[in-house]
């Protein structure tokens, strides 16, 4: 009940700001955890949220994130069929295995080569580091500056081109999913 109240309070905060979230994804994918996924599914139906992002790490094990991927993959909330009756679309979400190594082009090459979904999302947390700024720091286990440098690099653009990966905005992604739900 407290999860439901908290989610409704967060929804009301957005509504008061005249915003309507286009997708659901819980912090560290908590929206797929047992009990919570049922509450989130009710929220999706009640507020007609069009997209739910699902952790979609597929392929061979990557240490140290193998256990996380295994756990998330076996939860019923991680499966598109759990969300089917909500009339929302589901979108696979990749990158859990790269946390802490997101600036490594070889790791990206392996991850992107495994993705078979025509439309999917990958996780990055780029940012600009401000040395000495204790107020706005966080506990992210990687370098946001290194990630920003990586996704702005010529090598990154070349890798995407080589693997035939076309970056699109989230808005374009949702539009494509709505136009072609089987994508």
State the predicted function of each range:
Residues 1-23, 34-183:
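Terminal accessory/targeting
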Residues 25-31:
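Active-site histidine-anchored catalytic micro-motif
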